[in-house]
């Protein structure tokens, strides 16, 4: 067989142009597909259906972690330690050189191992998102990964699929295919039987089978892949890293410049002493672990998100999710269960001689019996026996749903040999199909409105005979049969999740294709408000007179949702919100949602989304419902909080080391040992690595990188700690305060013992600072993670042991005993407490909200009192008054000035009372009665397919 396929492998046969029957001959296959064994054999010949992956050298990847601006500074310090530090009759500083190299290797090793683990975990997760396809093997259809496809396979292509390989279409209705990613064509191309479709293009309409003619690198896309620009854009996260790194490097440069100017021309210090002082600033000031800590934190966070049912395709989407303040959510399946049921008693029949059960049967016949969507499953499931949907008939042709026609249809032959068609779909489309008269349209619209007031969707059914007995014929005129009510109950957790979202500062807007009345009713039930508008208002059309003067941007920003929405409206909503500086999330599941998902800051493909929607999204949900998204927001904020905590810590330590040791060196000409700074840096890095798993409180508001806050906090905290160290040095080295007060031995005149004391003081406070930066409230009230706590105490036991017992001549230290160690710990603890107060003061100056953290550990997501609940109640009251025909104030004054809420609260309370009365009335309707009886009998209305009272 291999020799027979050589021409195909070498591309000597033009499978794109030859007749379709010759394609089967050349590929040595049939319309029945390949066998499993033949598929495996061909996989060895043609290779997997994926592009070649670039193999990266592990060694080069490892060395790459030493190639960034922060590492360059450390490498410069290492060279300096042996090339420049050999003056004054002293040998090169080999200890510092080896220590710096060890520090670089340790950081690179941790980065390499963690990124490798994260990469493997991400690869495993992404494998679950790998494109899948329906393939015919061994005479059976099954869903397989697209990578196993080989030339000769028969595949099924339907709406929303990304075409898995180059293929020729077989018999069936034409497809509409979006090839813009490959050819640049903006409009979908129509492809009929026998024509070629390319791998990577998206099916926009239709359903058909095809024979695969090329896979992997042999496809049109595979050949062009090397032309695709693979340049990585510098993301926002990388820009932040660069800005913080540059700030630290500039701070060190300032410190070094001041030291050089003062030490050599003014103080005329020895060359080697000056080099040691410069090494201290270079080694201690550079946050060498920053890229490692932040990358590891993000990788671990991404893994945690996947465990919660949210797979991140783009790592930096985590920081955008943390800052999201508007979520545009689909209704069906996200806010509701997408478990549809039909109340038979409410079915309206418009055709003489037809019973309600027959309307249901027609709807079931116009549904799939396999590979069903929610509506198909509901229709077939309502039959006494699902087999009735195809009982006594022979299926000729099924027209699948598409976003343009918004209907499905089945052509079939009955037991008498007569041809018929039935169709179900959106009422407006079915009415147009039947060329319905004005009086019929009026009656149908009245029924639809009646359903909508109860939150029920409408599905219309029609039928026709086909005298010509061919599937291509138009048939006799269509007859409008009836309308069915569909009830899609809200998820049990949706109302609570929306309340949580509001408390977190995320405004949830419902974006639905359903009618306005249904959207308002669902919004009312979920407590998200009924301030909703039809999609036509987005284009400035059909606005009420009261809101005609409101700009579209304001309308989108203030609305609780929009109904009757098409994909182009979703894109417009996202665009306008982004223009108003909102960080916007958008959920979607269909191929037509892809542009809006791409445009949104965070595109979220919901569970069971099409391949096209998944491809355009940043985050793919593996579980249904809004609660997954809100959990992901909380987790993202926790991840972001860890990263922000570390950056503040890194800036603070740089300022503290640079200016603390610079002042000591210049004022008292005391030269701290570069080796001891290395020990501090190594212990700090070991402790700080655990921050990626720290227990943190997520921010109660949408969070983002605020460099002003990071730098301001870092400078103030670092400056305070530098002064604290300088004061300690002065008190211990130049006065008898500590010996007189605590009866410890005098360190004056003993430089080596002073070195040990100074080392311990710097080590304790440097690491203790992380507890201040990691907490939003008092640092001693927010319990840290166990790993961080253990790492801190282990590092401090080592540091204390070195200070107490160390006697290293090369590092110029000598043990100071437990008495001095206790004094230094006491000094550090006493001067630790003001750090929290300074943190609050900086936040208060910058944002004016930090004092709320001191009082109740909570920051409101808005400056409005009670989370703006009064404003929402006022809008809700406005809608209720309109509903009941009461007089309203001008729309422009719906949101009043401060102080006018009391009156509106009273209006809201009155409206609520009227709403409660309306609900009581609703209980006396048939649907309300059914729900009451079902509840009394202890049945679950969500799981019950249907119930008869």
Curated annotation (Swiss-Prot):
- Name any GO cellular component annotation: plasmodesma
Spell out the residue ranges making up region: Interaction with 14-3-3 proteins: 947-949
Compartments, as annotated in UniProt: Cell membrane
Q: What is the effect of changing residue 948 to A?
A: Impaired fusicoccin- (FC) dependent activation by 14-3-3 protein
On this chain, the residues bearing Phosphoserine are 932
Q: What CDD domains does this protein's entry cite?
A: P-type_ATPase_H
Family matches, as InterPro entries: ATPase_P-typ_cation-transptr_N, ATPase_P-typ_cyto_dom_N, ATPase_P-typ_P_site, ATPase_P-typ_TM_dom_sf, ATPase_P-typ_transduc_dom_A_sf, HAD-like_sf, HAD_sf, P-type_ATPase_IIIA
Does Nucleotide-binding appear among the keywords? yes
What Enzyme Commission number(s) apply to this enzyme? 7.1.2.1
Gene Ontology MF terms in the entry: ATP binding; ATP hydrolysis activity; magnesium ion binding; P-type proton-exporting transporter activity
- Topological domain ranges for the Extracellular compartment: 83-94, 266-274, 667-671, 732-752, 807-814
Record-listed Mg(2+) binding positions: 589, 593
Positions in the Cytoplasmic compartment:
1-62, 116-244, 293-644, 695-710, 774-785, 836-949
Q: Which reaction does it catalyse?
A: ATP + H2O + H(+)(in) = ADP + phosphate + 2 H(+)(out)
Tissue distribution is:
Found predominantly in phloem cells of leaves, stems, roots and flowers. Expressed in guard cells and barely in mesophyll cells.
Q: What is the protein's membrane topology class?
A: Multi-pass membrane protein
Q: Where does this chain mainly localize?
A: membrane
User: What name does this protein carry?
Assistant: ATPase 3, plasma membrane-type
Q: Which organism is it from?
A: Arabidopsis thaliana
């Amino acid at each position: 067989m291999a020799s027979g396929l050589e021409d195909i492998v070498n591309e000597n046969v033009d499978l794109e142009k030859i007749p379709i029957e010759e394609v089967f001959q050349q590929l040595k296959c049939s319309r029945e597909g390949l066998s499993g064994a033949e598929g495996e054999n061909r996989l060895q010949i043609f290779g997997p259906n994926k592009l070649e992956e670039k193999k990266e050298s592990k060694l080069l990847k490892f060395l790459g972690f030493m190639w960034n601006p922060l590492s360059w500074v450390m490498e410069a310090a290492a060279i300096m330690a042996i090339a420049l530090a050999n003056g004054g009759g002293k040998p090169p500083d080999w200890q510092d050189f080896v220590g710096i190299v060890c520090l670089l290797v340790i950081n690179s090793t941790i980065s390499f191992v963690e990124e490798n683990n994260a990469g493997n975990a991400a690869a495993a997760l992404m494998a679950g998102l790998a494109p899948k396809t329906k393939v015919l093997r061994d005479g059976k259809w099954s869903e397989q990964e697209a990578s196993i496809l080989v030339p000769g396979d028969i595949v099924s292509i339907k709406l929303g699929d990304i075409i898995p390989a180059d293929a020729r279409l077989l018999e069936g209705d034409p497809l509409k295919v979006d090839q813009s990613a490959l050819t640049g064509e903006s409009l979908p191309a129509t492809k009929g039987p026998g024509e070629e479709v390319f791998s990577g293009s998206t099916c926009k309409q239709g359903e058909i089978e095809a024979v695969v003619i090329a896979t992997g690198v042999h496809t049109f896309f595979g050949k062009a892949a090397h032309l695709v620009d693979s340049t990585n854009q510098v993301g926002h996260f990388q820009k932040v890293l660069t800005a913080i790194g540059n700030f630290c490097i500039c701070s060190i440069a300032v410190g070094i410049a001041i030291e050089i100017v003062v030490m050599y021309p003014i103080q005329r210090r020895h060359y080697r002493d000056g080099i040691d002082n410069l090494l201290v600033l270079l080694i201690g000031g550079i946050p060498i672990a920053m890229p490692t800590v932040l990358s590891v934190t993000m990788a671990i966070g991404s893994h945690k998100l996947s465990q919660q049912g949210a797979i991140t395709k783009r790592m930096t989407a985590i920081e955008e999710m943390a800052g999201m303040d508007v979520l545009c959510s689909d209704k069906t399946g996200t806010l509701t269960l997408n478990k549809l049921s039909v109340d038979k008693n409410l079915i309206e029949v418009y055709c003489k001689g037809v019973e309600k059960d027959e309307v249901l049967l027609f709807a079931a016949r116009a549904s799939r019996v396999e590979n069903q969507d929610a509506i198909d499953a509901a229709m077939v499931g309502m039959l006494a026996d699902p087999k009735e949907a195809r009982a006594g008939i022979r299926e000729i042709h099924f027209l699948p749903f598409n976003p343009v026609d918004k209907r499905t249809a089945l052509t079939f032959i009955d037991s008498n040999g007569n041809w018929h068609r039935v169709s179900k779909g959106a009422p407006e489309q079915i009415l147009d199909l039947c060329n319905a008269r004005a009086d019929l349209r009026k009656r149908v619209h009245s029924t639809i409105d009646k359903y909508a007031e109860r939150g029920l969707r409408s599905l219309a059914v029609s039928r026709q005979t086909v005298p010509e007995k061919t599937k291509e014929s138009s048939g006799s005129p269509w007859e409008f049969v009836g309308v069915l009510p569909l009830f899609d109950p809200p998820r049990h957790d949706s109302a609570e999740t929306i309340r949580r979202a509001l408390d977190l500062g995320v405004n949830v807007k419902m974006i639905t294709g359903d009618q306005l009345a249904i959207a308002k009713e669902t919004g009312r039930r979920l407590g998200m408000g009924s301030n909703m508008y039809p999609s036509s208002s987005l284009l400035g059309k059909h606005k009420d007179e009261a809101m005609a003067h409101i700009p579209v941007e304001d309308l989108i920003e203030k609305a609780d949702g929009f109904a009757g929405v098409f994909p182009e409206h979703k894109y417009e909503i996202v665009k306008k919100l982004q223009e108003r500086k909102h960080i916007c999330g958008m959920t979607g599941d269909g191929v037509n949602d892809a542009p809006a998902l791409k445009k949104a800051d965070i595109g979220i493909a919901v569970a069971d989304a099409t391949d096209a929607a998944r491809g355009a999204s940043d985050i793919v949900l593996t579980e249904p419902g809004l609660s997954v998204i809100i959990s992901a927001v909380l987790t993202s904020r926790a991840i972001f909080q860890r990263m922000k905590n570390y950056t503040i810590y890194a800036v603070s330590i740089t300022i503290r080391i640079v200016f603390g040791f610079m002042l000591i060196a210049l004022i008292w000409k005391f030269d701290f040992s570069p080796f001891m700074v290395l020990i501090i840096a190594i212990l700090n890095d070991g402790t700080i690595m655990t921050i990626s798993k720290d227990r943190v409180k997520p921010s109660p508001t949408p969070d983002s990188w605020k460099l002003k806050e990071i730098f301001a906090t870092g400078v103030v905290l670092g400056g305070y700690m530098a002064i604290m160290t300088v004061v300690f040095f002065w008190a211990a080295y130049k006065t008898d305060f500590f010996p007189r007060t605590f009866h410890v031995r005098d360190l004056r005149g003993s430089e080596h013992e002073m070195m040990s004391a100074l080392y311990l003081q710097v080590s304790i406070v440097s690491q203790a600072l992380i507890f201040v930066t990691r907490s939003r409230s008092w640092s001693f009230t927010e319990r840290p993670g166990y790993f961080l706590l253990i790492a801190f105490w282990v590092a401090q036991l080592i540091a204390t042991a070195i200070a107490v017992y160390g006697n290293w001549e090369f590092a110029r230290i000598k043990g100071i005993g437990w008495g001095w160690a206790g004094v230094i710990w006491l000094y550090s603890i006493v001067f630790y407490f003001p750090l929290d107060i300074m943190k609050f003061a900086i936040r208060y100056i910058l944002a004016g909200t930090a004092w709320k953290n001191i009082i109740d550990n909570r920051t409101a997501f808005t400056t409005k009192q009670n989370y703006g609940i009064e404003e929402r109640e006022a809008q809700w009251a406005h809608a209720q008054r309109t509903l009941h025909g009461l007089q309203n104030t001008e729309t422009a004054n719906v949101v009043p000035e401060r102080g006018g809420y009391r009156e509106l609260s009273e209006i809201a309370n009155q409206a609520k009372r009227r709403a409660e009365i309306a609900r009581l009335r609703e209980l006396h309707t048939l649907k309300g009665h059914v729900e009451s009886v079902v509840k009394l009998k202890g049945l679950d209305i969500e799981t019950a397919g249907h119930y008869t009272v």
